[in-house]
């Protein structure tokens, strides 16, 4: 159903290039493979992007497959909470460090850490635009978000 929605939305998504699926311990940007069979207990991150009228979109979400351990469920829940807490910090004249610290603090408070080399990014006419959004910079630092960027 998702592929049909993308095709019918008027986008010109090249799904092999714009869909990444990372299973279990893989951090990000995995590729679908007929050799990787998901089973009950696995967790998976699905990252889907489309292009509409020349503009890119990018969305990522973690899912539980079947019955997962409490450890894996907690990871999925905390990852979602980190995203939500980070988004609450996106406001005019706020700093990217405000977003980063909200994410990093919540991850660490729950026994996790963020991957230093992976972060957010700008998006628009190009898939990966500036700024790179590090999740390890401090509140009050980094690029200032202008009113029409938020």
Question: Which functions belong to the PLM regions below?
Answer:
Residues 1-150:
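Active-site neighborhoods and metal-handling regions in enzymes and metal-associated proteins
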């Amino acid at each position: 159903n998702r592929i049909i929605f993308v095709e019918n939305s008027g986008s010109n998504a090249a799904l092999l290039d714009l869909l990444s699926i990372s299973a279990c311990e893989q951090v990000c940007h995995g590729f679908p493979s007929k050799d990787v069979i998901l089973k009950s207990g696995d967790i998976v991150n699905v990252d889907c992007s489309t292009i509409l009228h020349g503009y890119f979109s990018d969305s990522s979400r973690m899912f539980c497959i079947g019955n997962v351990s409490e450890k894996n469920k907690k990871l999925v829940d905390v990852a979602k909470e980190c995203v939500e807490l980070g988004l609450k910090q996106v406001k005019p004249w706020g700093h990217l460090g405000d977003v980063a610290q909200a994410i990093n603090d919540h991850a660490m408070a729950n026994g996790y850490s963020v991957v230093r080399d992976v972060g957010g990014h700008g998006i628009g006419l190009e898939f990966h635009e500036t700024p790179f959004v590090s999740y390890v910079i401090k509140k009050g630092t980094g690029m200032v978000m202008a009113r029409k960027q938020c």
